[in-house]
Each structure stands twice: as C-alpha cells, then as structure tokens.
C-alpha cells in the first residue's frame, strides 16, 4: 500500500513536468492520460497551470471541464453533463467512482449500499463491493464492508481538491472547531481549579486534626504530671499504679489466708495440751 502511494507521487510529478510545456491537443491528450493513470487522484496543481486554464477558452474546453469534474465533482455530475463531455474509459469511470465514494465518506462514515449503488450507477452489490475493494487497494480509503447490514463503514479516506469558493466554509468550520476547543479547555481548567480547592481543603482539615491530636496529647501529659505531683509520686509510677489496681489487690489477699491457716494450727496445739 505505501509503495503504491510513493509511485503515485512520482507519476503525478512526471505529468506535471510534461504539462508545463504542453499546449493544445498535446495538453488535452496528456490530461486524458492523467485521468486514467492509476494512483493519481489529485488534480489541483494541474488546474492551476496557466496553459491548462487556457483550454477553457479553446477547442478543448470539454477536456478542461472533464478535468474539473475529476477534481471537484462526482460520477453523478459527469452523467448529468455526459453529452458535453468526452467519453470515459473503464479506468476513468472507476477512478471517478472512487472519488465519488470519497466525497460521500466526507459527509457520513457509514454509507448504505443503496446510496452507493445510486450514486455510482452500478447494477448490483457484487460490482459495488469489487469497486470498494479496488479503492482500498489503491489506498483511496480504508474501511470494511458490512454485508449483513448492507453498508460501507469508512475509517479513512483521502482528501480531495478544494475549490476557492469553499475556502470560506472551511475557515468557518475551523473557527467553530477552535471555539469548541476553547469551551472544552475552559471546562477542564474549571475542573482542575475545583480539584485543587478540594485538595487544599483536605490538607487544611488534615493539619487541623493533627494539631488537635497533638494538643490533646500535651493536655493528657500535663494532667498526668499534675496528678502525680499532687500525690508526691513519680509520674511514671503513678501511671503504673493507675493502670494495675487489680494486681495489687490480688497480692494482698493470699497473706490474709496464710495468717488464718497459722491461727488454726496454733489453736489446735493449745487444745491438745489442755487435754
């Protein structure tokens, strides 16, 4: 595919070089060769040549008009003027049909078979699909044939020559696109600003919580130290006693039981002597 595009550029340059020095019938013959040459789908540079424009006021005006149809028109445009234009070869018909598909693809990316059959004046779907496959291999467009839904889905198509009267419409379209981009950019900037504000609020809240926790720790430490000082004890020892009140109670209880045991044994010995 890429090799075809490269060869196409070389062929087009060759035709342009030959056209610079050609006039009259020789130039008209060269134009017909350009219209039939495989891979050549752009004709604006040829139309801009002064000697080519002179054909419009000569005996070869029909050839000049045919060139403009290939540059800007469609196969339907040719059929509408066929009586005043030179007949097309099969290769020229296929090329003009390829360009007609490109024109349709610029307006809609999913083109029904019915629309294509009418626009290209084809009799059946087989001819249509063969034509589209040929256009794909020529790198005129890329897409897929949806046979189930009977439509052509276009992913890419080449650009066509632009007429001077279309420049204002193109400029307007670009201006609208720029305005749309500015609106989108403004919306993005607003969202970024909101995100930054939310981030700052969360950071402030985090710092506030950390400050409150630090103050609370200081308060607890001061309160504990004051309580320990009031009882003339070491603050750490005071905290230890506060944490383990139950363990101190359990250590005193066994001593009481032991004393009770000794008392019983002593009384038993005294009772024995009296007997």
From Swiss-Prot:
In its record, the post-translational modification comment is:
Phosphorylated by CK2 and PKD kinases.
- Grouped into one coarse class, the protein's main location is cytoplasm
State a single Pfam family of this protein. CSN7a_helixI
Provide ranges: composition bias, Basic residues: 254-263
What's the domain of life for this entry? Eukaryota
> What InterPro entries does this protein's entry cite?
COPS7/eIF3m, CSN7_helixI, PCI_dom
* Coiled-coil residue windows: 185-233
User: Basic and acidic residues bias located where?
Assistant: 235-244
Gene Ontology biological-process entries: COP9 signalosome assembly; protein deneddylation
UniProt keywords, alphabetically: Acetylation, Coiled coil, Cytoplasm, Nucleus, Phosphoprotein, Signalosome
Q: What protein name is recorded for this chain?
A: COP9 signalosome complex subunit 7a
Record the organism.
Answer: Mus musculus
């Amino acid at each position: 595919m890429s090799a075809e595009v490269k060869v196409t550029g070389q062929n087009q340059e060759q035709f342009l070089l030959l056209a610079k020095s050609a006039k009259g019938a020789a130039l008209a013959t060269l134009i017909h060769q350009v219209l039939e040459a495989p891979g050549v789908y752009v004709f604006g540079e040829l139309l801009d040549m002064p000697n080519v424009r002179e054909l419009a006021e000569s005996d070869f005006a029909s050839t000049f008009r045919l060139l403009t149809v290939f540059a800007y028109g469609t196969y339907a445009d040719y059929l509408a003027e066929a009586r005043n234009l030179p007949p097309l070869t099969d290769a020229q018909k296929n090329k003009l049909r390829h360009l007609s598909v490109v024109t349709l693809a610029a307006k809609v990316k999913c083109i029904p078979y019915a629309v294509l059959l009418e626009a290209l004046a084809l009799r059946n779907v087989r001819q249509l699909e063969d034509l589209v496959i040929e256009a794909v291999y020529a790198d005129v467009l890329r897409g897929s044939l949806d046979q189930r839904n009977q439509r052509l889905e276009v992913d890419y198509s080449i650009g066509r020559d632009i007429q001077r009267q279309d420049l204002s419409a193109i400029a307007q379209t670009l201006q609208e696109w720029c305005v749309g981009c500015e609106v989108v950019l403004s919306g993005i900037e607003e969202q970024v600003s909101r995100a930054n504000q939310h981030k700052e609020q969360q950071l402030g809240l985090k710092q506030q919580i950390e400050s409150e926790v630090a103050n609370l720790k200081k308060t607890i430490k001061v309160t504990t130290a004051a309580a320990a000082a009031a009882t003339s004890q070491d603050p750490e020892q005071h905290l230890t006693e506060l944490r383990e009140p139950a363990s101190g109670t359990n250590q005193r209880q066994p001593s009481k039981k032991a004393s009770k045991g000794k008392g019983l044994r002593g009384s038993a010995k005294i009772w024995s002597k009296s007997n």
